[in-house]
């Protein structure tokens, strides 16, 4: 499965300005592209909402060889209830630790050389105070699971991920498609996984010809297919094919055809300006305030 790639994790954003400040100024990521949409996504990329929304990709380098964050902002939604499903992203960056201290962004030491911080909305990030040993500082995404063995069967046997580490006592496992890619860490928890409204989505690419086979495999194994194979359009950019799956705990997983995605995900030198212009033009808070209405909760 060396042809598969870990691409990004999707976050729902309630305050775009503060969130961009965190990713850009605290973590030190750059805006790779920014896209505005007038209506909801056919694959529910922005969540189960059908109004105006935007997508901003941020990362430490081009999407071809970096795991990045997708920030989805729904103009009419002001809050998303957090669940226990997303347990954090770990990255190696002494610069991010230094930035957080300089900007007085809250940091708490959780182990020697490791600090916990939160993005707006409560999403946890773990910063290792060291230089990255690979070109991409993003090391792993940690998701909660209710039954580690069942999850390992799904992610490894069905989705073809290699198991890099497994600790029965600590109920955790580390998986990935390649040594130099961001890994997926599965952490067993007591009780059920609660996705609430802030739930995200992890995305991978594979050769486009594998998408129908992947969908057929999930049908045969009686696993969830949230969105059967569909084409997604982005104004002025490449059309991609995706299938959206869910693992045994309901974590959303997007598989996208790699060839078209490499076209779509090319870095846009105007991305940062497009985002800044969109934030400046966003009067949704004022619109709701003048009508004495709160934005809806997700």
From Swiss-Prot:
CDD domains found in the cross-reference section: GLOD4_C, GLOD4_N
UniProt keyword Cell membrane present: no
PROSITE patterns named in the record: VOC (PS51819)
Domain of life: Eukaryota
Phosphoserine carried by residues: 131
Record localization: Mitochondrion
Domain VOC: start-end pairs: 5-130, 137-258
An annotated GO cellular component: mitochondrion
Modified residues (N6-succinyllysine): 109, 273
Alphabetical UniProt keywords: Mitochondrion, Phosphoprotein, Repeat
Subunit structure and binding partners: Interacts with NUDT9.
Family to which this protein belongs: Belongs to the glyoxalase I family.
Protein name: Glyoxalase domain-containing protein 4
The organism of origin for this protein: Mus musculus (Mouse)
């Amino acid at each position: 499965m060396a042809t598969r790639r870990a691409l990004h994790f999707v976050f729902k954003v309630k305050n775009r300005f503060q969130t961009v400040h965190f990713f850009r100024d605290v973590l030190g990521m750059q805006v790779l592209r920014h896209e505005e949409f007038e209506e909801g996504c056919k694959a529910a990329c922005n969540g189960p909402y059908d109004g105006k929304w935007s997508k901003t990709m941020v990362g430490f380098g081009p999407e071809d060889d970096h795991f990045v964050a997708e920030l989805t902002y729904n103009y009419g939604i002001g809050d998303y209830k957090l669940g226990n499903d997303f347990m954090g992203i770990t990255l190696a960056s002494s610069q991010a630790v230094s930035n957080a201290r300089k900007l007085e962004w809250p940091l708490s030491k959780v182990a020697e050389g490791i600090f916990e911080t939160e993005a707006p909305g409560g999403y946890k990030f773990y910063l290792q105070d060291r230089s990255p040993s690979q070109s991409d500082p993003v090391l792993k995404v940690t998701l909660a699971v209710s039954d580690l063995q069942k999850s390992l069967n799904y992610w490894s046997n069905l989705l073809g991920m290699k198991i890099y580490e497994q600790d029965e006592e600590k109920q955790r496992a580390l998986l990935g498609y390649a040594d130099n890619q961001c890994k997926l860490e599965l952490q067993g928890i007591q009780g059920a996984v609660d996705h609430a409204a802030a739930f995200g989505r992890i995305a991978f690419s594979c050769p486009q010809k594998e998408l129908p086979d992947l969908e057929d495999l999930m049908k045969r194994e009686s696993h969830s297919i949230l969105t059967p194979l569909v084409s997604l359009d982005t104004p002025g950019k490449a059309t991609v094919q995706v299938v959206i799956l869910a693992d045994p705990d309901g974590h959303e997983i997007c598989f996208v055809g790699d060839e078209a995605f490499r076209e779509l995900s090319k870095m846009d030198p105007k991305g940062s300006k497009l985002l800044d212009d969109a934030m400046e033009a966003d009067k949704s808070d004022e619109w709701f305030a003048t009508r004495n209405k709160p934005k809806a909760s997700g």
